[in-house]
Amino acid sequence: MKLYIGTKKGLFIHAGRGIGKPHFLGDPVSMVLPDSDGTLYAALNLGHFGVKLRRSADGGKSWEEVAAPEYPAQPAGSQDKTPWKLVQLWALESDGKRLWAGTIPGGLFTSENRGKSWQLVESLWNRPERAEWGGGGYDHPGIHSIAIDPKNPKRLTVAVSTGGAWQTQDGGSSWSICAQGMYAEYMPPEQRFDQNAQDIHRLVLCPARPEVMWAQHHNGVFRSTDGAKSWQDVTAIRPSKFGFAVAVHPKDPDLAWFVPAVKDECRVPVDAKLVVARTRDGGKSFQVLRKGLPQEHAYDLVYRHCLDVDRTGKRLAFGSTTGGLWLSENQGDSWRCLSTQLPPIHCVRFG
């Protein structure tokens, strides 16, 4: 088992014997992808020097720079208020043949040559609804979740903060919005159920049952059992319905995990106690898991890409804004702290 941890100060790898020396020390790593073919990708956000993408064919022993997604020039006279410039590579996924990249300011890109070149998915970028997308945690909108149906890789669902969820059935040639049933408490009453105004924090699907999806939304937890055609509000979650991260078991669509927090005002664990919420029955009930987690003076926030489950469905790991990293080998019943001294963590992935 390898665990990849992207942080504000580099990429760390835990290979079972502890955490190794950092790669790209000092550079913010916004996303990492351990691809099924053994290739490792790391996205760096170097601020003034731009977004960079690194690729390794030997598990991180050596790295080479490959192309980062690039936006075309904004057309003359365009009224688009969103800049046509890459701000961050926020999501990175593979369907086995193609790479998919979600970015801020809201463009989706694809590569068919392992990152040597990228193409903007214009069919989504040119949707008129995009003009209404807005920034959530950032100044501009962004695609942070790319859920690929393993049984039909041409079916993708992406989530936008803030711009709802969008789905393609034909590999990106056409798109339809798919956030029916979600609600936005921050909008005026007449726009509460506007699908294009939904601030989804994270969206995942169950690989064995891809029609079942889970979403952690700014205003709650939602679940779909019909491939995102409709969403149901999951009200049983505790100790709060706010959070960023969600993970679903690879084979059991009813088993999912969340890391709740206090919404908006201060964004810390409820009562300063770090817990994980788990459901085994599709959201009808939840267990609050705390064994091995700090239960006083815990101010750890777990970002949307910082909770992951491995392919067996037994191991989970999550990292926090305060540099804490925890591992469970029994589906969350108990947790072991791997570190409390890492830089703020941006993403955690098994590989």
For each predicted feature, which ranges?
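Extracellular glycan-interacting surfaces
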Residues: 1-351
